[in-house]
Amino acid sequence: MDDDLTEYAPDIPDNVLELIFSYLKLQDLRNCSLVCKSWNRFLNDENNEVWRAQCMQKLSPDAFKTDLLSVVPTYKAKLRAFFHAWNPYDCSRHVYIKPNGFTLHRNPVAQSTDGSRGKIGFQHGRHAWEVRWEGPLGTVAVVGIATKDAAIQCHGYYALLGADDQSWGWNLVDNLLLHNGDAHGIYPLLNNAPKYKVGERIRVILDCDDNTLSFEKNYEFLGVAFTDLPDKVFYPTVAAVYGNTEISMVYLGPPLDG
């Protein structure tokens, strides 16, 4: 950066920064946040006009018509969630992503199990996202993680997520943990653990530092589901069989402890 600009950069008023930054792309905004403390402070306000404008440009108006994004209260958090949402190019051919960008719809195709992965995978750090099932579960409704090598569609009604060594899942229908084609016990470890009810919020917690996968239901931590995960890139993934069922996923960022 020019020496003169470096000298005066911290003194640029917020209203001028807002005007300048409103013309920039996201990558440019990230670079600007590294220029000086003043610019970093301004961009750390996740609800300012710059992030609101970016959010309005990228997200469909449909995304704001429900309470789906209420779990990510700031504009920047909503924008981040959008970039982590379901990937329309990495899902079963029987699935489409609705205009809101966060909800998948499974078409009523007989004898098929269909899934979808998120746009961004994780190999480092701690990550949490919320999944909400709308509509009947059918015989298979699995939520979890998968690598890019895991199948995303198969013939028949089958617990596809957890069917091989590239995916790990929790079947909400029978509370079984699934991996490598095997059931790994009932989850959570409770006597007569309650079954999932449509509309309940499932929070998936992937800890790439401790190599574990855990779940919460309605903000109650259910315990660690899987340990000793391999050092691979994992994507938020679901698998469903019921026609016209809809599944929403909202990325939350690092989980809050406690």
Curated annotation (Swiss-Prot):
Pathway: Protein modification; protein ubiquitination. Keywords: Neurogenesis, Synapse, Ubl conjugation pathway. Its main location: other. Residues 64-256 form the B30.2/SPRY domain. Residues 6-54 form the F-box domain. It holds the Pfam family SPRY. InterPro entries: B30.2/SPRY (IPR001870), B30.2/SPRY_sf (IPR043136), ConA-like_dom_sf (IPR013320), F-box-like_dom_sf (IPR036047), F-box_dom (IPR001810), FBXO45-Fsn/SPSB_families (IPR050672), SPRY_dom (IPR003877), SPRY_FBXO45 (IPR035784). GO terms for cellular component: neuromuscular junction; SCF ubiquitin ligase complex. One of its GO terms (biological process) is proteasome-mediated ubiquitin-dependent protein catabolic process. It comes from the Eukaryota. It is found in: Synapse. Belongs to the FBXO45/Fsn family. Required in the presynaptic motoneuron to down-regulate the levels of wnd and restrain synaptic terminal growth at the neuromuscular junction (NMJ). Component of an E3 ubiquitin ligase complex composed of hiw and Fsn. This is F-box/SPRY domain-containing protein 1. The lineage of its organism: Eukaryota, Metazoa, Ecdysozoa, Arthropoda, Hexapoda.
